[in-house]
C-alpha cells in the first residue's frame, strides 16, 4: 500500500482519537462515589516521617521497616507521609528535585503498600509557601509535576494532597490549587486528590473553597486543634499558648457542644457539595494532662467516624506522639483513645 500525505494525516487523526477515547474511558470508569469509597478505605490513620532524619540520611532513620507493620497491626488503615521537597531543590530554573528525595519517598510508599496501608502524600511546605504564595507557586507546580510523574504508576491506594495548611487569601489559594490540579491530572487522571481549606485547614473556611464541579475524585481536608489553648498549651512554637499550663478538657456538655457545632458545620458543607471529608490532623500536645488528652482525642476521633470522615492523627513520632521510638513502645493511652478496639 502506498502511503500518501492524506493517508498519514488520517492515521494521526485516528491515533489521536483512540488515545483521547482511552483517556476519557479511564476517567469515566470511576464511579461518581469513588472519592467517598476511597475515603471510607482511608479510615483511621497517622502522620509519619515529616521530621525524621531519614530524609537526609537513611542510616540515621528513626522510623524503621517494622513500624509500618506495627501501625497496621495496631488497627490503622492509612499513613499520611509528610514531605518537604523544597529542601531537596537542585536550585536550577526547573526546580529539579534531588533523586535522594524520591528514594526515601519510594521506600515509604512501598513499605506502606506492602503492609496494606493506604498512603496520603502530603506536600508539607506551607511555612515557606505562605511567605509569598504567588512567588512560590511556580516551585510548587514544578515539583508536583515531578512527583506526580514519578508516582503515576502506583496504585490508587496512593493519594496526593496538594498543600498542607495553605495560609493565604482564599482567592489566591483557589487559583494555586486549580493550577496544581491541572498539573496533577495530566499524569494522574484517576488519582484521588486531597484539597484543604486555608489558614490551618480550618472548618470555617470551607465556604471559601472552590473545586472543579466536573471532577468528583477529590477529598477535602480539614484539621482540628480546638480549643487551641488546650491542645497547644506549653508548645514552644505557639506564641500565644507556649506559657499556658494546667488547662483541662473534661468532656463537659459545653465542650462537647463546641466540637459538635464545628463538626456539624463541616458535615453540612460536605452534604451540600457532595464532597467527602478527611480530618488530616488532630492532636493535643504533651504538656496537657494525660487524662484530658485521652478524653479529647477519643471524642474527636469518634465524632469524625460518626460522620463517616477518615482521619490521620498528628503524629507517630516527634511531638503529639502516639509511639515512643526511644522506648520502642506505643503510648498506650493515646493509641487506645484513637482505636479503642480493632475494627473487625
What is each PLM-predicted segment?
Residues 26-80, 95-96, 269, 335-337, ...:
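N-terminal carbohydrate-binding accessory modules
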Residues 52-55, 90-102, 127-135, 163-171, ...:
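The substrate-binding groove and active-site-proximal loops of carbohydrate-active enzymes
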Residues 1-28:
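Bacterial Sec-dependent N-terminal signal peptides
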Residues 60, 67-78, 94-125, 129-159, ...:
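An active-site-proximal structural segment forming one wall of the substrate-binding cleft
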Residues 48-65, 87-98, 229-257:
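Acidic/histidine-rich helix-loop elements
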Residues 32, 141-255, 260-284, 306-312:
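Active-site region of glycoside hydrolase catalytic domains
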Residues 57-73, 140-144, 259-266, 293-297:
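Short, acidic/polar
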Residues 289-344:
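Aromatic-rich peripheral "rim/lid" segments of glycoside hydrolase catalytic domains that contact
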Amino acid at each position: 500500500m502506498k502511503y500518501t500525505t492524506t493517508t498519514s494525516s488520517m492515521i494521526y487523526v485516528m491515533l489521536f482519537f483512540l488515545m483521547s477515547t482511552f483517556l476519557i474511558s479511564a476517567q469515566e470508569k470511576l464511579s461518581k462515589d469513588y472519592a467517598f469509597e476511597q475515603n471510607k478505605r482511608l479510615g483511621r490513620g497517622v502522620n509519619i516521617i515529616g521530621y525524621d532524619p531519614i530524609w537526609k540520611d537513611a542510616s540515621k532513620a528513626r522510623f524503621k521497616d517494622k513500624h509500618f507493620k506495627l501501625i497496621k497491626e495496631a488497627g490503622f488503615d492509612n499513613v499520611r507521609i509528610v514531605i518537604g521537597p523544597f529542601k531537596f531543590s537542585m536550585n536550577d530554573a526547573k526546580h529539579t528535585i534531588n533523586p535522594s528525595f524520591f528514594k526515601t519517598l519510594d521506600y515509604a510508599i512501598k513499605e506502606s503498600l506492602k503492609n496494606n496501608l493506604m498512603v496520603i502524600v502530603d506536600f508539607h511546605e506551607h511555612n515557606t509557601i505562605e511567605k509569598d504564595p504567588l512567588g512560590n507557586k511556580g516551585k510548587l507546580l514544578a515539583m508536583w509535576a515531578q512527583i506526580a510523574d514519578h508516582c503515576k504508576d502506583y496504585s490508587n491506594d496512593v493519594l496526593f494532597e496538594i498543600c498542607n495548611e495553605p495560609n493565604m487569601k482564599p482567592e489566591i489559594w483557589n487559583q494555586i490549587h486549580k493550577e496544581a490540579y491541572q498539573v496533577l491530572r495530566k499524569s494522574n487522571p484517576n488519582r484521588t486528590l486531597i484539597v484543604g481549606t486555608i489558614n490551618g485547614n480550618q472548618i470555617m473556611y470551607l465556604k471559601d473553597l472552590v473545586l472543579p464541579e466536573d471532577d468528583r475524585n477529590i477529598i477535602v481536608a480539614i484539621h482540628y486543634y480546638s480549643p487551641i489553648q488546650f491542645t497547644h498549651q506549653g508548645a514552644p512554637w505557639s506564641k500565644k499558648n507556649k506559657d499556658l499550663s494546667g488547662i483541662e478538657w473534661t468532656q463537659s456538655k459545653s465542650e462537647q457542644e463546641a466540637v459538635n457545632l464545628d463538626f456539624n458545620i463541616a458535615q453540612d458543607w460536605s452534604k451540600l457539595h457532595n464532597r467527602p471529608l478527611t480530618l488530616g490532623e488532630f492532636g493535643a500536645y504533651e504538656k496537657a494532662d494525660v487524662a484530658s488528652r485521652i478524653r479529647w482525642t477519643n471524642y474527636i476521633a469518634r465524632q469524625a467516624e460518626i460522620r463517616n470522615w477518615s482521619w490521620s492523627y498528628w503524629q507517630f513520632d516527634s511531638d503529639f506522639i502516639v509511639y515512643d521510638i526511644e522506648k520502642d513502645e506505643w503510648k498506650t493511652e493515646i493509641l487506645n483513645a484513637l482505636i479503642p478496639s480493632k475494627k473487625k
